[in-house]
């Protein structure tokens, strides 16, 4: 199973996934943060890293602590607008998708929502200290408009996978307003994707999101057949 990161709208115990990164932390997300937003999560990631060899302690830790980055919606709105100029100057071809993505998030906000980022699986692909340094370096590079200092490339054409993240398979059911799947920006970028390599990634997101649906259908048909056999047995016995 792939290491994934998620951006989602959180309201109490409810989480509505917007998009997911596969083996990466999409760079649009990083335009929404500042150093203060990462301070507490990084400390928790470091603690989690120390507990990884003790499954019992690690499980208890995850039950007691939320290790995700959580942003108030208004702060997200301000950061998204403020850092848009970074894209406008350095990667203008990404603006159409970025604007559609921000609009998609804001259109689906409910009262009491916060914007969450679950990065732990991707963070743990390396040492926490290494990943934390890269994220903080990226935040500074964006703030100071120094694209050469970024830890990711702005020239890669796969904006869906590397910049926005892949939309959740069930997004159309959970997040109905300004659905990113229906936007011209998303459809335009989808056409640019490598039809072979990127289809594999899309298939991974779809199959994981579908979960055990084929298995459930198989059980349903087996039970239906057994039920019909039982009815026939009663009728003809």
State where each predicted segment sits:
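Short, extreme N-terminal segment that most often corresponds to the first beta-strand
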Residues: 1-39
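Acidic, proline/glycine-rich low-complexity IDRs
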Residues: 1-5, 10-11, 110-230
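Low-complexity, flexible helical/coil segments
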Residues: 15, 39-47, 150-159
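Low-complexity, serine/threonine/proline-enriched polar segments
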Residues: 39-90
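Well-ordered, non-membrane alpha-helical segments in soluble/globular domains
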Residues: 88-103, 134-144
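Leucine-rich repeat
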Residues: 106-107
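Juxtamembrane boundary at the C-terminal end of a transmembrane helix
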Residues: 230-237
């Amino acid at each position: 199973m792939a290491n994934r990161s998620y951006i989602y709208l959180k309201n109490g115990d409810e989480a509505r996934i917007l998009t997911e990164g596969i083996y990466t932390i999409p760079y649009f997300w990083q335009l929404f943060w500042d150093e203060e937003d990462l301070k507490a999560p990084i400390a928790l990631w470091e603690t989690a890293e120390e507990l990884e060899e003790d499954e019992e302690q690690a499980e208890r830790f995850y039950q007691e602590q939320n290790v995700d980055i959580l942003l108030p919606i208004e702060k997200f709105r301000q950061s998204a607008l403020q850092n848009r100029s970074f894209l406008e100057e350095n990667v203008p071809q990404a603006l159409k998708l970025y604007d559609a993505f921000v609009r998609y998030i804001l259109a689906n906000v409910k009262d009491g929502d916060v914007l969450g980022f679950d990065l732990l699986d991707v963070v743990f692909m390396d040492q926490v200290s290494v990943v934390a340094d890269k994220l903080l370096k990226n935040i500074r590079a964006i703030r100071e408009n120094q694209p050469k200092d970024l830890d990711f490339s702005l020239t890669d054409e796969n904006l869906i996978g590397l910049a926005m993240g892949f939309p959740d398979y069930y997004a159309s059911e959970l997040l109905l307003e300004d659905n990113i799947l229906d936007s011209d920006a998303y459809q335009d970028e989808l056409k640019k994707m490598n039809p072979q390599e990127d289809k594999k990634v899309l298939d991974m997101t779809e199959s994981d999101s579908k979960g055990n649906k084929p298995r459930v259908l198989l059980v349903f048909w087996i039970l239906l057949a057994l039920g019909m056999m039982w009815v026939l047995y009663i009728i003809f016995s």
